Amino acid sequence: MAGSRKVAREFTLQGIYAWMIGGADVTLIAANLKEDEQFKRADEAYFRTLLYGVLKEEDMLSSRIAPLLDRAVAELSPIERSILLIGAYELLHCPDVPWRVAINESVELAKKFGGTDGHKYINGVLDKLAQDVRAVEIEHAKKRD
């Protein structure tokens, strides 16, 4: 049975956070996360796609979300920034993930790991990004609704 993408996103968040805080090598971070007993529940391929993809594209992803923020990217908490990077990566690079799912999963990460109202901020920023990068998909959804 394939693992859960939801769990893969949670481990990706932990990996990006560890990379931001400690600056350790991503391969070492991934190896450490895989030792966690709960990792077997994760979709490992999706975890690798997200973790390595987000870190490879971090500058581009940050530049895409920066104009949508009310503060500098560097002023975001590491958790908020990590979640926004994951959501932005999914919106930009994972067309198999519906835009609503990408946003909702990021909001759920923020509710679980972020500050009190961080999920509202995450939702607002990613919704603006989706309006730009998934405009055709959103327009189709509006016509169906």
Curated annotation (Swiss-Prot):
Q: What does this protein do?
A: Involved in transcription antitermination. Required for transcription of ribosomal RNA (rRNA) genes. Binds specifically to the boxA antiterminator sequence of the ribosomal RNA (rrn) operons.
Give the protein family: Belongs to the NusB family.
Query: What is the protein's name according to its record?
Result: Transcription antitermination protein NusB
Q: Name one Pfam family in it.
A: NusB
Tree of life domain? Bacteria
Q: Say if the entry is tagged with keyword Transcription.
A: yes
Q: Which GO terms describe its molecular function?
A: RNA binding
Q: Which InterPro entries match?
A: NusB-like_sf, NusB_fam, NusB_RsmB_TIM44
Which of UniProt's keywords are assigned here?
RNA-binding, Transcription, Transcription antitermination, Transcription regulation
What HAMAP family does the record point to?
Answer: NusB (MF_00073)
